[in-house]
Design a protein with these regions (language model features):
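ATP-dependent carboxylate-amine ligase catalytic core
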Residues: 22-29, 34-37, 41-44, 70-156, ...
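C-terminal helical cap/extension that packs against the catalytic core
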Residues: 201-220, 309-312, 318, 351-410
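Active-site-proximal loop/hinge segments that shape catalytic or ion-binding/gating pockets
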Residues: 416
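Short functional linear segments
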Residues: 1-53, 60-62, 66-71
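Nucleotide phosphate-binding/pyrophosphate-handling subdomain across enzymes
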Residues: 134, 139-144, 152-162, 166-170, ...
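Acidic, Mg2+-coordinating active-site environments of NTP-dependent enzymes
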Residues: 143, 160-245, 262, 266-282
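Short internal beta-strands
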Residues: 78, 194-199, 338-340, 359-367
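Short Gly/Thr/Asp-enriched flexible loops that form oxyanion-binding sites at enzyme active sites
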Residues: 64, 149-159, 424-428
């Protein structure tokens, strides 16, 4: 098989949550444990940090990976979803797993795993852990796919667990209250493994504290003693932070929501500092300043061009848009133009209520079966006095926005990681 044929096989022969939604979700770790045993428990050959949460997992995971790389470690990074290439999910020191390794994994192992009927994520997790062990990474940042307690990454025993925040998402699997969702996320809290909680409310704090007490695990709430004292936009891009323990740091990632992520990361760094894993403050500054270069991160308030300024961002739910909407509203420009689409398991009405009413909209739909039809998005937008035209693809919507824009305008592309993925994929092909 070619690489493209291999990726198509993975997507078409295993249930993929990003494509089909609920039918791809599997409760339980039975298949994961069978795969893990077959590959001789690869996750036991490297240290790990486990990252769960509704929003901010990707930014926190990539920033931690960058800091650890700057410290001199060989670092594995497992995240989802990908934007352009499947291999983005599995990286070592910012380098994606090779196409040949993906091909070999499927060709050599399919006779074993096909009778198990694994989900896409179960198979991808097995590939990631196997790759990290073979590459002899020192430490891996492992991002939870969905939930925590029953997520197939939850076979690891990390040196640190992180839960970024909790909001109402994937309620059909995780529960329809913050407390119920927190209980699922708290499933990654392990016996005597410290856990950092990025953001919380009383309803979730109770759950996290109870689980940590049961596991005799140190629990640290990042908001109790904030590691970030203040922040402001850096003139050369990104955000400048004044920190409690590490002086002034410039973070490469833009977007007002990154202050919360930075606070979570720095609180986690303090735990790693106490363990002797991180020893140099210079590594922290270097990691923050070079996240994209060191890890290949895309889609976080990512600048695609200037004049007109074009920004894309993968924020896709109420929690993410709480910050994104304010950032967009504050953006100085002649006219805001927003290319927007969403998928059908998100609260379209809640996000619509946050969108700026002074923008011109280009309603579209990403190329996933889970997408809200662009016509449905436009129809819902009418209820909020938001107006624009409908486009059948993200690229068509983006090209229309570019054609309409003056140099002083601001174009934002987002609403879903799949919208951003479609755009970046199309731009790469041009």
């Amino acid at each position: 098989m070619t690489y493209q044929e291999t990726v198509e096989y993975l997507f078409n022969s295993t249930p993929v949550f990003e494509h089909v939604g609920a039918s791809a979700y599997k409760e339980g770790l039975e298949t994961t444990k069978v795969l893990d045993e077959h590959f001789a428990h690869p996750h036991t050959h490297f240290l790990s940090i486990h990252v769960a949460g509704t929003n901010g997992k990707g930014s926190c995971s990539h920033t931690l990976a960058a800091i650890l790389q700057a410290e001199g470690y060989k670092v594995g990074l497992y995240t989802s979803p990908h934007l352009v290439d499947f291999r983005e999910r599995i990286k070592v020191n910012g380098e994606m797993i090779s196409e040949q390794e993906v091909i070999d994994f499927v060709e050599q192992e399919r006779n074993f795993f096909e009778p198990l009927h694994p989900s896409f994520f179960e198979l991808t997790t097995a590939l990631a852990f196997k790759h990290f062990a073979e590459q002899k990474v020192d430490i891996a940042i492992i991002e939870v796919g969905l939930g925590g307690r029953l997520d197939c990454t939850n076979i690891i025993t990390p040196i640190l667990s992180i839960i970024t925040n909790i909001s109402l998402e994937h309620t059909q699997f995780l529960g329809n209250t913050l407390g119920a969702i927190a209980a699922e996320k708290a499933g990654i809290i392990k016996h005597r493994v410290p856990v950092v909680i990025g953001e919380s409310v009383p309803e979730t704090q109770i759950v996290f504290k109870a689980k940590a007490q049961k596991e005799d695990a140190l629990i640290v709430f990042a908001e109790d003693i904030p590691a970030v004292l203040s922040s402001h936009p850096n003139p050369d891009g990104g955000i400048a932070y004044q920190t409690r323990f590490f002086g002034n740091i410039v973070g490469e990632l833009g977007g007002s929501y990154q202050e919360k992520n930075a606070n979570t990361v720095l609180t986690a760094v303090m735990q790693l500092y106490n363990k002797g894993v991180i020893k140099n403050a210079e590594s922290i500054a270097k990691g923050f300043a070079n996240v994209c270069e060191l890890t290949g991160l895309m889609g976080r308030w990512q600048k695609l061009q200037a004049n007109p300024l074009v920004i894309c961002d993968t924020g896709h739910n109420v929690g993410g848009w709480t910050y994104l909407s304010q950032q967009i509203k504050r953006q100085p420009c002649k006219q805001k133009r927003i290319v927007f689409g969403m998928v059908d398991d998100k609260d379209l009405h809640a996000v619509m209520s946050m969108l700026p009413d002074d923008a011109i909209y280009y309603w579209t739909q990403p190329s996933t079966h889970r997408a809200f039809p662009a016509e449905k998005v436009a129809e819902t937008a009418d209820d909020y006095d938001l107006h624009g035209k409908v486009y059948s693809t993200v690229l068509e919507a983006y090209q229309a926005a570019l054609q309409d824009a003056d140099e002083q305008d601001f174009i934002f592309v987002g609403g879903s990681s799949y919208v951003v993925a479609d755009l970046l994929t199309s731009l790469q092909k041009k």
